[in-house]
């Protein structure tokens, strides 16, 4: 099975840097590591968000696409999708934290059921301290 996949995310200036950091860390810590993380900057970002993007922990996987002004999630993802180089794309929001085996489980499912076009999963929501589930 081809384990290559891209991750597609969008971020804009009102996002919390600690959430973006946790989201990126959850993807770089996958049991099957992504080939790339395509991150669309939907307009100018804060200094704190820019610092997260420069973190060496993510730098080798991060492919940044920048929009001059905020265009909204749909437009940002439409710009980012053609930049993804893999057949399979895992979608993440900049405040999502993925289980460490999320992508492995999803890719194994796709291997078993190759007729699948779109695949999702369950979520656990959090408020405030993202290390604690609601």
Predicted segments, located by residue:
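Nucleotide-sugar donor-binding/catalytic module of glycosyltransferases
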Residues: 1-134
């Amino acid at each position: 099975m081809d384990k290559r996949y891209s991750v597609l995310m969008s971020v804009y200036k009102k996002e919390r840097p600690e959430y973006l950091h946790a989201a990126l860390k959850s993807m770089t810590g996958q049991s099957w590591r992504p080939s790339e993380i395509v991150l669309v900057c939907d307009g100018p970002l804060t200094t704190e968000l820019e610092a997260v993007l420069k973190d060496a922990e993510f730098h080798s996987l991060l492919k940044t696409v920048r929009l001059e002004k905020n265009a909204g999630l749909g437009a940002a993802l439409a710009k980012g999708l053609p930049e993804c180089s893999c057949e399979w794309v895992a979608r993440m929001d900049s405040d999502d934290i993925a289980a460490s085996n999320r992508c492995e489980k999803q890719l194994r499912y796709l291997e078993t059921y190759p007729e699948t076009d779109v695949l999702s999963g369950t979520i656990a929501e959090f408020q405030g301290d993202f290390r604690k589930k609601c």
